[in-house]
Amino acid sequence: MKPQCILISLLVNLAYAEEYLVRFKNPTAFQQFTSNSNRSWRQFIDNKIEKKFSIGSFRGVTMNLSKNLVNKLKKSPLVADIVPNFRFEAFEGDSVNSAESSYTFNATAKYSYEDVEEEQNITYQPDAPRHLARISRHYQLPFDVGDKDRYKSWFNYYYEHDYQGQDVNAYIMDTGIFADHPEFEDRVIQGIDLTKEGFGDQNGHGTHVAGLVGSKTYGAAKRVNLVEVKVLGKDGSGEASNVLSGLEFIVEHCTKVSRPQGKKCVANLSLGSFRSPIINMAVEGAIEEGIVFVAAAGNFNLDAYWASPASAENVITVGAFDDHIDTIAKFSNWGPCVNIFAPGVEIESLSHLNYNDTLILSGTSMSTPIVTGVAAILLSKGIEPEMIAQEIEYLSTRNVFHRRTLFFKPSTPNQILYNGVDKLDDPYDDETFPRLNIEAIAKELEEYNATLQTPMSENLQSGSKLWGWNNDVTLPLGEIRLKRRDFMKNL
């Protein structure tokens, strides 16, 4: 369609415009779209484009468009996708104590310990959090169902002293970070705030996540730098355009600031939406720039194919397992998109409210930063960014989950995170392990339902389908309860 014809349609429909994300097929298509020789076209486009995005080979814009114009533009050979500027959410899983509260507080936090040196550059953190102890051993940790605190102070976290992520910048794309917390030891860098709330964390999710990446007590990488990329507000959500702007910032900061300072780059994405080609392609564009991206699989007990950015190519996608019973968490997404599972049930980390309390949360949002911390360690050891996913899988502990529990999770990898420390597992006297009813666990995993809010529910009528989602099935939109088999029918 000629630009002049599209321009007429634009003018007719201005009063009915709303904001859309537009992805172009390639950089050349973007250039042709924005620099057409027709003066009226260029002037109109310049006025309507709110933001331009350039992330690797990804090119996109946000534009105020009417629905009629969307139908016109989608026929353009230059345009790949058009979607409303939908909402992104911080992934949260089941709360620990109730279905109403996402947070459990622990007022007995302690931030003083001394690492103990062992042989061959191996250091251990005594009285370590359970999630850290689990990733530095191959076999199950003891757990007493009748006395959950019985083994609380028994565990050590082993790691290599010289490789703690000290030459790595970890970008935390989330709700912000409580940067003044002493656990971060002045290693937080204010990157960008896209929420207009200002830097800092008014939600808690981002601080908890950052603590699992690199805090002194709860972090896998004890000396990594943490870059605050605030794309989600105090309610834990934000626009997809914020996520795109955050990705663009990460690429620019990594290439122009981090690398000239000798720093390597890894990004943590403990957030997500329903499957979106625009988000996936933007993340893939950022990965082209040599940045490691680690993403949460999601908490809907579905194939992670249906979540973004979990389904993006070359992202390290993380599922959650329960390290109390060494079984995939009932809420965790699964499937061939998942690279690795990490502890994600009742995970303790920092609070955004004060220095003394900690938070206990569950979800793939908690599993993901633990993997991000290990990725930072591997980058410190000289592993190339494009090899990090392969190295994490190579080091993993395999065949931990009972095969019966994977029966309804086809092509799901049976491997959990291991940090690669070269030592034998600690023995424990008077060990107690839960006696598991595998049939009951398998049944619960199969039948567990999660409430899924699709990102387009505010923009689309029930049962409609958004143009550009060529691989998606038509679903009733809004708040719906979905089982794995509902999706498998359409695969």
Curated annotation (Swiss-Prot):
Annotated Gene3D superfamilies: Peptidase S8/S53 domain
Annotated GO biological process: ascospore wall assembly; proteolysis
Cellular component GO terms, alphabetical: ascospore wall; extracellular space; nuclear envelope
Function, in words: Subtilisin-related protease involved in the formation of a protective dityrosine layer required for spore wall assembly. Identified in a screen for mutants with increased levels of rDNA transcription.
Provenance organism: Saccharomyces cerevisiae (strain ATCC 204508 / S288c) (Baker's yeast)
PROSITE patterns with a match to the protein in the record: SUBTILASE (PS51892), SUBTILASE_ASP (PS00136), SUBTILASE_HIS (PS00137), SUBTILASE_SER (PS00138)
Active site: D174, H205, S365
All residue ranges annotated as the Peptidase S8 domain in the record: 142-442
Region forming the signal peptide: 1-17
Alphabetic keyword roster: Glycoprotein, Hydrolase, Protease, Serine protease, Signal, Sporulation
Glycosylation sites: N38, N64, N106, N121, N268, N356, N449
The protein's Enzyme Commission number: 3.4.21.-
PANTHER family the record matches: PEPTIDASE S8, SUBTILASE-TYPE PROTEINASE RRT12
Family statement: Belongs to the peptidase S8 family.
Gene expressing this chain: RRT12
GO molecular function: serine-type endopeptidase activity
Domain of life: Eukaryota
Stated name of the protein: Subtilase-type proteinase RRT12
